[in-house]
From Swiss-Prot:
The gene is ttcA. Pathway: tRNA modification. This is tRNA-cytidine(32) 2-sulfurtransferase. Belongs to the TtcA family. Its main location: cytoplasm. Coiled coil: none annotated. The keyword Iron-sulfur applies. One of its GO terms (biological process) is tRNA thio-modification. It comes from Shigella sonnei (strain Ss046). Its EC number is 2.8.1.-. Keywords: 4Fe-4S, ATP-binding, Cytoplasm, Iron, Iron-sulfur, Magnesium, Metal-binding, Nucleotide-binding, RNA-binding, Transferase, tRNA processing, tRNA-binding.
Length: 311
């Protein structure tokens, strides 16, 4: 009996550490990009996946201790996909006491009608979903729209655009919506997917499958995701360093004439960012920038349902 109690305490301790890290990551992202302001009404887009559940949970937790006042309203889009469990999210949100709205739109039927069998439906589905969410945000009086993309999603998008699109473009933590009327935020921008997965497993969120529409996963994105996971295992700290690089861009040492006036460089111009170091040996640190020792993976994997909330 005493041994079981010790295991439970250990599980609780490890979950507390994990939740504190997620809280810290989200808090830093909110502060760095001024994502949430006094009086904001945040529309939390809840898909039923691990990312959006975690986002809602951490935002609720931060709401209790934040120095500013803001409100949350969870929104789910029921796209009428076959087999969608309509009861799951309402039951979960009512149990939490969270304000919510379920928007019912048969986008599944529209996509099936417009897209030939065997072709990917994701692009049209995404456009339809985006428009509905923008409209819903206006109806609810939301000042911000929160999406559940995390650090791994952002890096994957960067490499997708580099490898297949020929441009250095990622996924911004904060942006103006397509219609120019809403501010979209990504509070999980600094969070690692593996932390989110462990947290979701420990909390036993009622996950809704993301493939109900029958669409196949994006093969190109999957290749990139596998590549990043392999790097993360073989080269500790590489992922952190790459993400740090996205926050430390030096336009004068790239090739985009729209970002830097290369034509304006003439005799007598000032040295910019150290000038040309091409002939100098690069000083590479022994450990990648942004790297921190990984916590005991076995301890974090022991997380179960016996949890205590971090206030």
């Amino acid at each position: 009996m005493q041994e079981n109690q010790q295991i439970t305490k250990k599980e609780q301790y490890n979950l507390n550490k994990l939740q504190k890290r997620l809280r810290r990551n989200v808090g830093e992202a909110i502060a760095d990009f001024n994502m949430i302001e006094e009086g904001d009404r945040i529309m939390v887009c809840l898909s039923g996946g691990k990312d959006s559940y975690t986002m809602l949970e951490i935002l609720r937790n931060l709401q209790q201790s934040a120095p500013i006042n803001f409100s949350l309203v969870a929104v789910n889009l029921d796209q009428k996909q076959p087999g969608f469990p309509e009861h799951v999210l309402p039951e979960y949100l009512e149990k939490l006491g969270v304000e919510y709205k379920i928007v019912e739109e048969n986008t599944y039927g529209i996509v099936k009608e417009k897209i030939p069998e065997g072709k990917t439906t994701c692009s049209l589905c995404s456009r339809l979903r985006r428009g509905i969410l923008y409209r819903t945000a206006t109806e609810l009086g939301a000042t911000k729209i929160a999406l559940g993309h995390h650090r791994d999603d952002i890096l994957q998008t960067l490499f997708l655009n580099m490898f297949y699109g020929g441009k250095m473009k990622g996924m911004p933590p904060k942006l103006m919506s397509d219609d120019g009327k809403h501010i979209v935020i990504r509070p999980l921008a600094y969070c690692r997917e593996k932390d989110i997965q462990r947290f979701a497993d420990a909390k036993a969120f009622p996950i809704i499958p993301c493939n109900l529409c029958g669409s196949q996963p994006n093969l190109q994105r999957q290749v990139i995701a596998d590549m990043l996971r392999d790097w993360d295992k073989r080269y500790p700290g590489r992922i952190e360093t790459m993400f740090s690089a996205m926050q430390n861009v030096v336009p004068s040492h790239l090739c985009d004439t729209n970002l830097f006036d290369f034509k304006g460089i003439t005799h007598g111009s000032e040295v910019v960012n150290g000038g040309d170091l091409a002939f100098d040996r690069e000083e590479i640190p022994l450990q990648p920038a942004g790297w921190q020792p990984e916590e005991d993976e076995n301890q974090l994997d022991e997380l179960r349902l016996n949890v205590v909330e971090v206030k």
